[in-house]
Amino acid sequence: MSTEQPQRRTGAGYEADPSEVGRVLLLYSGGLDTSVMLKWIQDHYEAEVVCLTVNLGQPGEDYAVIEDKARRLGAIECHVVDARERFAHEYIARAIRANAIYGNGYPLFTALGRPLIAELAVEQARASGCDTIAHGCTGKGNDQVRIEATIAALAPELKVIAPVRSWQMGR
């Protein structure tokens, strides 16, 4: 009988161990946090990075600039998915019909978008041969829960990296 103790991992079972990471799908906004993450993932995990940017109708975004920036920073692929119609019909319209609001009338549009973004990330990760998905959510809000729970439910084989949470950095 072996006296060797089983290895214990810290964090949730879906969190990536550096030795398990080969190719990462990064949910990429083009902002400072996710741009730093792109390089950090390449350096820390010695991994290839595929970027995914999801257009849910955010105003003022130039998706060609975002894609170009990701490529200049070393992403091996960069995908921009226009999910506005799907988001409007499958999420927003249903929320309006259900009178889904939070607190004093705050619409839940940001929260509603996270499961769709995670679903699209799973699809793209599989299509691009990624074993891990990275996101820029902090450890403070529920966005990380919405994204990670959706990934775990749809693709338990995929691991998750949450650099902002791991770094324990403030903004």
What would you call each of these model-derived segments?
Residues 2-171:
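ATP-dependent adenylation/nucleotidyltransferase module used to activate substrates
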